[in-house]
């Protein structure tokens, strides 16, 4: 049995306006950060389907990256990726990049 892509999965329930979550950014408490290795990505969009915070940036069914303002670092995206295209890295590795 092969996995279906996001376009082949029947529509279930969709919350298109998830409360007031967009009003509240994650802040500085995220411990792990997802990193996309685009060369491995097959744009199956499982990450987009499973992300509880709508932090996956996609355009026309193509994975573009992450909205780190809302990503909690839970790792669901990395866990569901069939090609291991998403790696979870410690947030401390990025402190010098952000000042």
Curated annotation (Swiss-Prot):
Residues the entry annotates as binding [4Fe-4S] cluster 2: 51, 71, 74, 77
Keyword Protease: no
Entries under InterPro entries matching the protein: 4Fe4S_Fe-S-bd, 4Fe4S_Fe_S_CS, PorD_KorD, Pyruvate_synthase_PorD
Keywords, in A-Z order: 4Fe-4S, Electron transport, Iron, Iron-sulfur, Metal-binding, Repeat, Transport
Residues holding [4Fe-4S] cluster 1: 41, 44, 47, 81
Molecular function terms from GO: 4 iron, 4 sulfur cluster binding; metal ion binding; oxidoreductase activity, acting on the aldehyde or oxo group of donors, iron-sulfur protein as acceptor
Cofactors that this protein relies on: [4Fe-4S] cluster
Gene3D superfamilies named among the record's database cross-references: 3.30.70.20
Cofactor comment: Binds 2 [4Fe-4S] clusters.
Residue ranges annotated for the 4Fe-4S ferredoxin-type domain, each copy included: 32-60, 61-91
Pfam families cross-referenced by the UniProt entry: Fer4_21
Subunit structure: Heterotetramer of one alpha, one beta, one delta and one gamma chain.
Protein name: Pyruvate synthase subunit PorD
Organism encoding this protein: Thermotoga maritima (strain ATCC 43589 / DSM 3109 / JCM 10099 / NBRC 100826 / MSB8)
Taxonomic classification: Bacteria, Thermotogati, Thermotogota, Thermotogae, Thermotogales
């Amino acid at each position: 049995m092969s996995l279906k892509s996001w376009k082949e999965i029947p529509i279930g329930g969709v919350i298109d306006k998830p409360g007031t979550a967009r009003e509240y950014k994650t802040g500085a408490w995220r411990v792990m950060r997802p990193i996309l290795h685009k060369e491995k990505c097959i744009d199956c969009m499982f990450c987009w389907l499973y992300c509880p915070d709508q932090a996956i940036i996609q355009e026309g069914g193509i994975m573009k990256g992450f909205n780190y303002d809302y990503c909690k670092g839970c790792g669901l995206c990395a866990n569901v990726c069939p090609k291991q295209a998403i790696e979870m890295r410690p947030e401390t590795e990025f402190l010098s990049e952000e000042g």
